[in-house]
Amino acid sequence: MTKYIFVTGGVVSSLGKGIVAASLGRLLKNRGMSVTIQKFDPYINVDPGTMSPYQHGEVFVTDDGAETDLDLGHYERFIDINLNRFSNVTTGKIYSAVLKKERRGDYLGGTVQVIPHITNELKDRVYRAGKETNADVVITEIGGTVGDIESLPFLEAIRQMKSDIGHENVMYIHCTLVPYIKAAGELKTKPTQHSVKELRSLGIQPNIIVVRTEMPISQDMKDKIALFCDIDTKAVIECEDADNLYSIPLNLQEQGLDKLVCDHMKLECKDPDMTEWKDLVTKVKNLSKTITISLVGKYVELQDAYISVVESLRHAGYAFDADVKIKWINAEEVTESNIQELTGGTDGIIVPGGFGDRGVEGKIIAAKYARENKIPFFGICLGMQIASIEYARNVLGLEGAHSAEIDPSTPYPIIDLLPEQKDVEDLGGTLRLGLYPCKLQEDTKAFEAYADEVVYERHRHRYEFNNEYRQQMEENGFVFSGTSPDGRLVEIIELKDHPWYVACQFHPEFKSRPTRPQPLFKDFIGASVQAAEQK
């Protein structure tokens, strides 16, 4: 029978529940378990697709085109699995589904209520995740903080599941904070005690408490937490702040988190083989080189908006024994006169995806500077469109060339709306989303990176390169190294007379893994390392 683990959080948000859930998933997978994982978000939006990155951070896209929470990126990178649309559930999705059923008459005239209709729908989403993947274990992270009014239906639903399927098939892990009070020079357990009290008042007794802390906590403190929260002392797991996220699974394993889970759920687990993961952590701690990559974007104040890009750069760095430092550059502040100063000491420039006109001209200047000064350049999604516009303006001499998204009246719409998007009115869930094939042209940097003729990458865009300008661009040294199999959609562009200048319409950052870097990121960092060594 499938087992279900629920990860909740208390005291404050942003405790790292997602990292704990992902780490546990990795540990159980290495014990031979088939694992899937999902995130429940209590907000009323149907998905984060139309939310500002300042509100939510990155929107992570799955193979099947779901726009999801950034925690799914952590899940995929840690556990090395591909998730799907069942892996992210929001209040908006739940209420939408229930209301559709009510309109169809599925409830036979009954009064639709939070209990049982909303809670039943929530439980169904948990069970469905297991059925769709045939997983041994389903891990579900409950977003928000215990005590939030938005989370109450979610907590009630997972409370009911213990009675529905038996206590040995359900486990609750609660993440809390033990803050350090600098003036007193003490760690305090009281917030944890109150958070668990709140959770227990809702009918949920945690089996394990994971304590986030700035510094090691004493055994006496663990004993105190165990006493007041009515759990075994061994079930109080310390999660100290870490410089390297990938060391956390090893930290949790050392304290027996995965063994506690296996014992409680009566799982027949083999001994975990963490050799590859230990080698990764050792490598990360002993990188011998350092390079700097300038990231030119519009959301740089909130670095979570680019979290998969940053992690992908780091993964690629590991392959070259290089620590990748990010120089965050606000595209709105970039001008022709300061671009050299802003990117000083840079070994490579990356322009990631985005929407809207803010900062676009700064990104175009960055692409031009990288092209003219032979600095390795990588453009992603909007970054590819930016590179195309810059080349059209400054090499082909098409003054005023732009994207129809940014300037609908441009005389040269190098980037235009996808034909199937012309009659679309709703913004949410209507982009070109998910996994699509890309056919590569031989004797190009893209083909060299992938060493394959056809590759599959995840997309999230509404605009595309305008084929009316393809021949003109090709005749002037612009290389279309990747297209859709029918040749209609441009997927990858690059320059011949440049050490490494490549841009893609898709989002390669969504498929990178710490032990298996994404090919384009790997070659970009390889070129940047080479550039650094030649200085």
Curated annotation (Swiss-Prot):
Binding site for L-glutamine: Y54, G354, L382, G383, M384, Q385, E405, R462
Note in the entry: CTPSs have evolved a hybrid strategy for distinguishing between UTP and CTP. The overlapping regions of the product feedback inhibitory and substrate sites recognize a common feature in both compounds, the triphosphate moiety. To differentiate isosteric substrate and product pyrimidine rings, an additional pocket far from the expected kinase/ligase catalytic site, specifically recognizes the cytosine and ribose portions of the product inhibitor.
Biological processes, Gene Ontology terms: 'de novo' CTP biosynthetic process; pyrimidine nucleobase biosynthetic process
Positions of Mg(2+) binding: D71, E141
Protein name, UniProt field: CTP synthase
Annotated source species: Bacillus velezensis (strain DSM 23117 / BGSC 10A6 / LMG 26770 / FZB42) (Bacillus amyloliquefaciens subsp. plantarum)
Domain of life the protein comes from: Bacteria
Cellular-component GO terms for this entry: cytosol
Homology family: Belongs to the CTP synthase family.
Annotated EC: 6.3.4.2
Lineage: Bacteria, Bacillati, Bacillota, Bacilli, Bacillales
